[in-house]
């Protein structure tokens, strides 16, 4: 078997969407599993919408996810360049080859004339499939002269054979496109830029791509691409069209379902390992049904056979759970480094590590850290009502806490025990009211952890504030 070569070919017209990230991930996993090559190609032929800033963001997001590529626009490779805007000469060269072989032809129709033809076919109840007979009448000597005078170039159309095309898709199975289901289609636009289907085939063919794994919204394009492979006499890659990602309500995933870009999840404090784990299970399943997986485990267990046909549901709650699991898998040194930017406070690592240890099991998104940890940096804004029982209880506790020389959990527990012997507040009431006195909140980390982290002076000060209010 020849070396597996797969690619991810995004358009730099926006931020990397989770659907695109999943496509990149499946290609990456297959390349790493087979010892093949993962190629990054930038499809920037949409001159109006493509922006350099989005290309930079795509590259940044893929690097953050840990999906490193073997060839690409930033590192080069044997089959570059890896930006379509730098390959336009190739598209013209191969279009000319097809014209010379009678497999493609020039069309001197203006875009609005093509649109009128489309509307006419639809009004007649016909599919808007163009043929050479429909398009070549525009190629009059007068029109050619007009184009020349205006400095315009003709579009180039591919002459589609009227035959059935059969695709053996590794996810969908056998897919048949009946003869006449697709008409002739443009290869080069009148502005000289290639269409998606054409550029895609030229690039995949010249870059020796062996497998094309992508979303099933591209399935309808495949017949045009296969026809072009046959026209050039190139081997057709193996196609695999993975299921669409749906929102929790069963409709196509969109911004109304919440965050959909990798950048948004990153800014909310999702770990790349968690997002990769989650995306891998949208359209693929582990042979043993495991759900928490490292990238290495994903590589080792990945196979095309386990890609599923059914649409995948994007469940934000499951992603939160996975993120919390991956957070707990991190060493404290790693977590301090990753989490510190989300804290928005200048704090030394040792103190922050103690706080993280106390709140780690409560973190779903690292962006929650300011809210989860504010009790360690701010005195409570609201204090519980002062009652005679509480005053007596916490005056006694304060006295016991002041006696402690070595501030640790054992000493604090001992102080609790002594204070409660004569306390008017017992058990649950003792601890719940003390939590409110120290934090102003009814829930949070273990109470003993709060006292230990705050330290003797701060605890004494907070209890004194309550008693003296």
Curated annotation (Swiss-Prot):
InterPro entries: aa-tRNA-synth_I_cd-bd, aa-tRNA-synth_I_codon-bd_sub2, aa-tRNA-synth_I_CS, aa_tRNA-synth_I_cd-bd_sf, Glu-tRNA-ligase_bac/mito, Glu-tRNA-synth_I_codon-bd_sub1, Glu/Gln-tRNA-synth, Glu/Gln-tRNA-synth_Ib_cat-dom. It is an enzyme of class 6 (ligase). ATP binds at residue 255. Keywords: Aminoacyl-tRNA synthetase, ATP-binding, Cytoplasm, Ligase, Nucleotide-binding, Protein biosynthesis. It comes from the Bacteria. One of its GO terms (cellular component) is cytosol. A motif ('KMSKS' region) lies at residues 252-256. Its main location: cytoplasm. A motif ('HIGH' region) lies at residues 10-20. Its EC number is 6.1.1.17. Catalyzes the attachment of glutamate to tRNA(Glu) in a two-step reaction: glutamate is first activated by ATP to form Glu-AMP and then transferred to the acceptor end of tRNA(Glu). This is Glutamate--tRNA ligase 1. The lineage of its organism: Bacteria, Thermotogati, Thermotogota, Thermotogae, Thermotogales. The gene is gltX1.
């Amino acid at each position: 078997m020849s070396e597996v070569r797969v690619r991810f070919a995004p358009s730099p017209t926006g931020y990397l969407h989770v659907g695109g990230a999943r496509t990149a991930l499946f290609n990456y996993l297959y390349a790493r599993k087979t010892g093949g090559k993962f190629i990054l190609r930038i499809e920037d032929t949409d001159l109006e919408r493509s922006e350099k800033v989005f290309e930079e963001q795509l590259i940044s997001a893929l690097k953050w996810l840990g999906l490193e590529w073997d060839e690409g626009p930033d590192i080069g490779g044997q089959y570059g360049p890896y930006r379509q805007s730098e390959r336009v000469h190739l598209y013209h060269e191969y279009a000319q080859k097809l014209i010379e072989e009678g497999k493609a032809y020039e069309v001197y129709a203006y875009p609005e004339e093509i649109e009128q033809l489309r509307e006419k076919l639809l009004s007649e109840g016909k599919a808007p499939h163009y043929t050479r007979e429909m398009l070549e009448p525009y190629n009059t000597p007068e029109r050619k002269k007009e184009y020349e005078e205006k400095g315009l170039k003709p579009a180039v159309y591919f002459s589609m054979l009227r035959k059935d095309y059969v695709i053996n898709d590794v996810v969908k199975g056998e897919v048949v496109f009946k003869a006449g289901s697709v008409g002739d289609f443009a290869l080069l636009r009148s502005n000289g830029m290639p269409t998606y289907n054409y550029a895609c085939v030229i690039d995949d063919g010249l870059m020796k791509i062996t497998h094309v794994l992508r979303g099933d919204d591209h399935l309808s394009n495949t017949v045009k691409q296969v026809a072009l492979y046959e026209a050039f006499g190139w081997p057709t890659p193996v196609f695999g069209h993975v299921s669409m990602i749906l929102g929790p309500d069963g409709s196509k995933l969109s911004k109304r379902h919440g965050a959909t870009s990798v950048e948004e999840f990153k800014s909310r404090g999702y770990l790349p390992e968690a997002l990769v784990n989650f995306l891998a299970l949208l359209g693929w399943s582990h042979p043993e049904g495991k759900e928490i997986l490292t990238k290495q485990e994903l590589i080792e267990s990945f196979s095309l056979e386990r890609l599923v046909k059914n649409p995948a549901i994007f469940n934000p709650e499951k992603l939160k759970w996975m993120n919390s699991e991956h957070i707990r898998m991190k060493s404290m040194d790693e977590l301090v480094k990753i989490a510190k930017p989300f804290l928005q406070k200048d704090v030394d690592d040792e103190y922050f590590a103690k706080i993280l240890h106390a709140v780690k099991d409560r973190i779903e998104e690292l962006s929650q850290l300011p809210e989860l940890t504010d009790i360690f940096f701010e005195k409570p804004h609201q204090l519980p009502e002062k009652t005679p029982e509480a005053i007596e209880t916490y005056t006694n506790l304060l006295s016991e806490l002041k006696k402690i020389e070595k501030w640790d959990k054992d000493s604090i527990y001992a102080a609790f025990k002594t204070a409660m012997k004569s306390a008017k507040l017992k058990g649950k009431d003792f601890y719940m009211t003390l939590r409110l006195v120290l934090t102003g909140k009814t829930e949070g980390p273990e109470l003993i952890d709060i006292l230990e982290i705050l330290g003797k002076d701060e605890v004494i000060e907070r209890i004194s504030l309550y008693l003296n209010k």
